[in-house]
Amino acid sequence: MPRKTLTELAQNPDLIPGIYNYCDRWCERCPLTSGCLVYTTESDPTDNNDTLNHDVRNAVFWQTLSETLAEVRQLIPEWAKDALNLNHPPKQKTITRQRNVDNHPLTKAGKQYANNASDWFRKLDLDSDPPSTSAKCGSEVARQNPQPFDDAREVIQWYQYQIAVKTMRALSGRKEEIEDPETADFPKDSDGSAKVALIGIDRSIAAWRLMQLSLPDCAESIVPLILQLETLRISLEQSFPEARAFIRPGFDSIPPA
């Protein structure tokens, strides 16, 4: 069967307009690929049933990770007690025209986390044999059941750099919104980008918790990374207070009036 043109594909009523504007570009883990024009143009047109099964599997995966996030939220206050005051992180100033997005504290915090995560995995891999499935600290747990370890690593490394990138997009977008007051009555692109960054932070925190459970002897060394993400989350929410309420096409339901 000949491949459909982009115009023909776009006429599919099951597609969700604009769903790809505020996603994390992780098609392999997306639960809504059946409604995405971008995914449809890149996938095999004969695999419709497989696409639906793919979406169901991914929905279950993210629901499980969401439950892990709820668990780790209960642990963070105890971990943070002697490390830092998460209730009162430094407040972020509103970005101005002169402020360089690259040098914004939120950007720096996102990049610093990415570097620290790289350092952690580098040390882990030096102590591991093989590095993809087990590690010196708690290697027996990971060796007996490698899937949680592999899933956690995959999630962490997917969002590792994206958090800073999406944060920078949010900061840059807000700068443009300040300069163009005509956009004031519309949903803010900066809030949408900030929400994607926040979701990346949430999922990374949950994945680090899975890593703790897979590598119990490494659990303590993971705590600073979780606290770093939690501090960034709070600061980002302070800087973009409407971000969590932003409605992403397809991913978020519109609350009843």
Model-assigned labels for residue ranges:
Residues 1-74:
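N-terminal cysteine/histidine-rich coordination modules
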Residues 42-46, 52-110, 116, 120:
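Metal-dependent nuclease catalytic cores that hydrolyze phosphodiester bonds in DNA/RNA
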